[in-house]
Each structure stands twice: as structure tokens, then as C-alpha cells.
């Protein structure tokens, strides 16, 4: 878990106003430090933002007796050849972005949102057994595409984490009930071609015994907020079977409006962020 952010700037000047912006964007769970020397940096549970090229930074860390393998750092105004996977062009990013960078660098699943009752995060391959249990409660639901056999699903999940989460920074996420800690469903954002254009589609499913508690609505509300505030998405679609009345009612409750219909296919609903 990210607990500390160190802004270690050596070659450029950062005004106090910029540092104050970072402080304003953090929350009470994350501390901000402005070290004068690399010796002052504790790499455990920390993200370092620095203008020092990666190779040079790791050499400095090793010279101080620190393990450079523990370094989780993002470049600030660094060049593509400086080695960092993530580069911050500005320091006024929100805490969600810093947590995302830290998750990518550590390989931990990124927590997308936390609501009153739910926690929504990226999935890992370790979640597959629980995910199969969720889908087993929905085997008779014709609106849901079932998972592959385990070996194929495992390979699919590995590629999904790398190519969907890693490239688009969104996808289908896992939904956990906070009070029990149990996996109760999936919800998130997928890509779909509509009118020849790649658009974003919201998707959701809830474990059978956890339905009718308002969890799908709560999860989708949080996802729409994240899509607007963190991803800058301006519109979202929902593709709903004509006979899927619960899903249609949920979409309309969320603010989706009918966009297009076909004679023999699903209906298309659209949400425009105001």
C-alpha cells in the first residue's frame, strides 16, 4: 500500500506553490516528503517522483547502501530514454493517479473506488477461484457469457491485465462487499465499436445471492464517477438485451437514455457526462 510520496528534485527548481498543490491532492493516508538527499528516502511503501534519470538514481541509492530493486519511482520532466515507465509532466495529479502508478510499479491490483458498502479493484490471477464461484451462481442467466475452462481463462486473464489494464487503464474490475470481504461480482468499462467508432461500454454482474441489495447501482455509480473524474471520459454506453428488464431499469436509474434499437438485437443506451 502506498504510504509515502517523495519528491526528489535535483536538476530543476520547483516552487512552493507546486508542492502545495501536491499536498492538497493527497489524503490523510499518504505522507509527502521533500528530501534534500537520497539517503533520506525510505523506499518501503513509497513512490519517488524525481527528475534524476533512472540509472543514475539507482546508482545513488546503491551508493547509500540501499537496495535499488526496492525503488518505485516515476520520472518528472524526464526524457523517454531516462528509463522510467511512468513520467509525470506535472505535479498537480490527484492521489488516484499516484496510487495507480504505484500499483503498476509494484504489480499490486489498483483499487479503483471504495463506496459505503463496496470496494472495486483490478483483478489478479489469484482471484480466479472466487470468480468461478460467482459465475457458478449465474449459470442459468442467458445474458452472461460464462468463463473459459481454467487454463484458458488463466491465460486470458494474464493478457487482460497486461493489455487492458496496462494500456487503457480501465476494464472489468472486481466488486467486493466490504463487511464480508467476499467477491460479489464484476463491473467496469469495456471497449465496443459503435457506428464505426471505439466507444466505452459499462458492464456489470452481481452474484445471485447478493442481488436486490442495490450493489450493482452503487458499483456503477462509482465507476461512472471514476470514468469522468479520473479518465476524462465524456460518454458511456450500455448494451442491453430487450428482455433484460432489471438491467434496463438499472441503466435508466443511473441516467442512461435509449440511443438506438434494432429489430433482432440488443438496445443501446447512452450516458453523457454533464
Provide a role label for each language-model segment.
Residues 52-54, 238-248:
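Conserved beta-strand-loop-alpha-helix junction that forms the acyl-donor binding cleft
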Residues 43-45, 170, 233:
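Short, high-confidence coil segments that cap the C-terminus of an alpha-helix
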Residues 230-239:
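Conserved GNAT acetyl-CoA-binding A-motif
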Residues 1-113:
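Asp-based, Mg2+/Mn2+-dependent phosphohydrolase catalytic module
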Residues 4-8, 21-24, 89-209, 226, ...:
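GNAT-family acyltransferases
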Amino acid at each position: 500500500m502506498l504510504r509515502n510520496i517523495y519528491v526528489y528534485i535535483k536538476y530543476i527548481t520547483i516552487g512552493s506553490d507546486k508542492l502545495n498543490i501536491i499536498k492538497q491532492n493527497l489524503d490523510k493516508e499518504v505522507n509527502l516528503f521533500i528530501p534534500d538527499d537520497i539517503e533520506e528516502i525510505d523506499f518501503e511503501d513509497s513512490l519517488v517522483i524525481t527528475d534524476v534519470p533512472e540509472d543514475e538514481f539507482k546508482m545513488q541509492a546503491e551508493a547509500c547502501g540501499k537496495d535499488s530493486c526496492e525503488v518505485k519511482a516515476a520520472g518528472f520532466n524526464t526524457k523517454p530514454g531516462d528509463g522510467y515507465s511512468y513520467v509525470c509532466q506535472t505535479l498537480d495529479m490527484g492521489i488516484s493517479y499516484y496510487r495507480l502508478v504505484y500499483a503498476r510499479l509494484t504489480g499490486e491490483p489498483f483499487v479503483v473506488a471504495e463506496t459505503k458498502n463496496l470496494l472495486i479493484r483490478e483483478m489478479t490471477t489469484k482471484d480466479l477461484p472466487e470468480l468461478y464461484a460467482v459465475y457458478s451462481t449465474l449459470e442459468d442467466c442467458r445474458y452472461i457469457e460464462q468463463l473459459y475452462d481454467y487454463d484458458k481463462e488463466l491465460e486470458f486473464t494474464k493478457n487482460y491485465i497486461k493489455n487492458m489494464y496496462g494500456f487503457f487503464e480501465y476494464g472489468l474490475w472486481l466488486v467486493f462487499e466490504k463487511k464480508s470481504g467476499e467477491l460479489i461480482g464484476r463491473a467496469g468499462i469495456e471497449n465496443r465499436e459503435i457506428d464505426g467508432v471505439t466507444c466505452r461500454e459499462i458492464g456489470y454482474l452481481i452474484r445471485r445471492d447478493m442481488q436486490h441489495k442495490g450493489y450493482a447501482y452503487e458499483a456503477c455509480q462509482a465507476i461512472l464517477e471514476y470514468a469522468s473524474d479520473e479518465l476524462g471520459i465524456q460518454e458511456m454506453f450500455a448494451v442491453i438485451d430487450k428482455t433484460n428488464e432489471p438491467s434496463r431499469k438499472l441503466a435508466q436509474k443511473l441516467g442512461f437514455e435509449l440511443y438506438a434499437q434494432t429489430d433482432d438485437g440488443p438496445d443501446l443506451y447512452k450516458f453523457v457526462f454533464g
